[in-house]
């Protein structure tokens, strides 16, 4: 067993069954070795890593346990399905974390301590929300 294993995007291109098998293998290796996992699949980090770092352009924006980072955003992530024509307004008026097309309609996640406006529902944050919140926070500070 190696003492250190570095893997870069190891699950990219794998089908779901192979991805699960490989993640289980990495988890087992992590019991006796240090595994450094570089990935853009945040779900893999949440499921696999006891400690993580979020980096952007070579700069470390956050280190810690994934669940602790997620807990910091508790009660501050809001979701709403909007019209494509309204996206620009939401980008200007709110701290937009992400936009995802669901059945052709944009669904946005907004970071806010309070309900941004009528129609938003509070959702449980995930590591993707943490990632985008840290990127936006870093961009504002720069």
Spans of model-derived segments:
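Extended interaction regions within the primary functional domain
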Residues: 1, 8, 117
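A short, proline-enriched helix->beta-strand linker immediately N-terminal to the Walker B motif
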Residues: 1-3, 32
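Catalytic Walker B motif of ABC-type/P-loop ATPase nucleotide-binding domains
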Residues: 5-9, 14
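Residue-level recognition of hydrophobic positions within alpha-helical transmembrane segments
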Residues: 14, 40, 124-125
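Helix N-cap at the start of a conserved alpha-helix in ABC-type nucleotide-binding domains
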Residues: 16-18
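ABC transporter nucleotide-binding domain
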Residues: 22-109
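C-terminal coupling/interaction segments
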Residues: 98-142
